């Protein structure tokens, strides 16, 4: 009897997942979107100090205003107006490690090419849903351990040092990059995380009106759902930057987690309506685990539940477009969320 019950439940779940995948599977083969990808890491490294003026001119011509953003804002130097900038960088204590990392980046060339093809396909999907959205120039860089993703109005920059696959090299990374951060530095995440950065800052930025935990969960869930729409063939684990084991924990504990989120405190307030930033962070901030739950809990469980809310909302409202979904307030998602699904 138990065996047949399992099969009975499994089939609808498969059908639901299939329907969701079908909805997001669109034909973008006729799209004219093409990405302009530039390699700042290759243009800069190794630093050649034999002709500084020529190197400065090359970097300015090839990367335009972003060169100034990179050197002055990201690396906190005097920029390319100062002829001592590059020699000073070459003499920094961290420079040998930067070059070791660059060797690791160069060994990932095939994966980088594939990820750029995937990212281009993602922007074709973005253009389908949001024709007015800007398609940025892509700059691939060795960020000297500063930024994994960085955006301006016209540039999406990817710090390849945050996606290196060589675990031996990563063991030597600066101590401010914790183990849980290095665990998620996978080349498989380049396209997805780059698009997440663009969606988060340029397409669906946070408004500042998000006051409760529920607001933040739904906001983040919407962006992850957007990611699924941009990359309909990607696994949920990749979309969330989870291992398969971490994702399995989410599904196994989904109902128990929801009970925690809806638990009422002594002030007669459910956890999802919490407004303290410190408490909200315990559910949605990156970390080794979701600190609001336990050290065994997959991190960012609030965000993952937000994705399930967005999925359920779109599943139950098939006439709603993705842009329209983004405009809905967080409470509307509660009506359709089913943690038992």
Where are these regions (language model features)?
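Sec-dependent N-terminal signal peptides
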Residues: 4-13
